[in-house]
């Protein structure tokens, strides 16, 4: 084993070394300098407190007092109102073409077949069917057509046939 290089005195309680006058004066000056720095930094009330100088603008909470940077007009400017452009309207079909589209509508045909079969339609489907049938009636009136034309022609033919029979022709 090697003998320890430390002194046997170091193992016990070490005596406190007295500081020289110069060291005491230097420590006093350091304490005074630290005491002067106590308190808040100048302008801390307006600056918002603890802000680190190294991370300005990064991950710092945004000050609510700083507003928008958009320019504000200082003079009186007349407000220009934008006129609404109407949405592209459906191209107007002739009444004849619209009537043909409604008569060949597969959904309308399917719903009418369900009604004839005795099924009940939901309120939405029923209102849709009613609206389409009303539109068909309007178009037929515009065009001078009616459902009764076919029936009237048949009745007229029957009456003519009866008249021929009565006359003996």
Curated annotation (Swiss-Prot):
The keyword Ligase does not apply. The gene is yihI. Interacts with Der. A GTPase-activating protein (GAP) that modifies Der/EngA GTPase function. May play a role in ribosome biogenesis. Keywords: GTPase activation, Ribosome biogenesis. One of its GO terms (biological process) is ribosome biogenesis. Residues 49-58 have a biased composition (Polar residues). This is Der GTPase-activating protein YihI. It comes from Escherichia coli (strain 55989 / EAEC).
